[in-house]
Amino acid sequence: MPLQFKSFARPDLLKTIHPKHLANLLEPHRRFLEDRGFSLSAGGEQELDCLALAGILAQPDEETPSDLVEALYVIESFSDDQHFDELLAMAEASGMEVGEEETTVDLAVRLYLHDANLLERKLREQLCDRRRTFESYRLADPASGIEVDNLPRDLTPLEADLDRYFESKKRGGHSCVVRKDAANEIRFLVQHGQTCKREPSRKGGRSTCTFFRPEKTDVVLLDLTHKE
């Protein structure tokens, strides 16, 4: 994921998060923020300095905590009001109490703090629904059917096979496959590494290089209607 915060580098959006929830989200990264002159001592009901915080987020470097990058990226993806109902359903299913005056972004922050995997998995499912260009492969025997019930639910063996393949191609392991069933189709979201990169970067005032392995997400679609 690129080190970009887009909307969360805007102080007006940061202010939409309740100070208590924002402080809880930032607490694990207190030292990183304090080293850059940002104080979390206020917290509670008192407003944080969102202008200073936005300034820090707008200039990430290699010392920026990856957990903070991931958290803000996921929360931002669910900050619009159109996501409130699905966030509410997830919160209630998790046994969380939701107040009458809960805002969408506050609920997203609370859910992430409660169980980050809930929002991360939901975001992967949404990626499955995006329109893409596919290469199509039809059944060798069009008369044969596709037995959906015979498809495995446990994708761990598939992930292990993919790990061996990607590792042999110098793309690293730790692949992740997420299955999503829909009307007349089944989608598999495949997340895996790519070849490593080294790019020029800045560490404070010093010129340096950042070495990292990019991530790629592929979608495999099983079309039950057209058998391809």
Regions found by a protein language model. Give the residues of each.
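Intrinsically disordered, low-complexity polar/charged tails and linkers
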Residues: 2-215, 219
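Long, well-ordered mid-to-C-terminal structural blocks that present hydrophobic/aromatic surfaces
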Residues: 227-228
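Broad, structure-driven detector of short, well-ordered beta-strand segments within folded domains
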Residues: 220-224
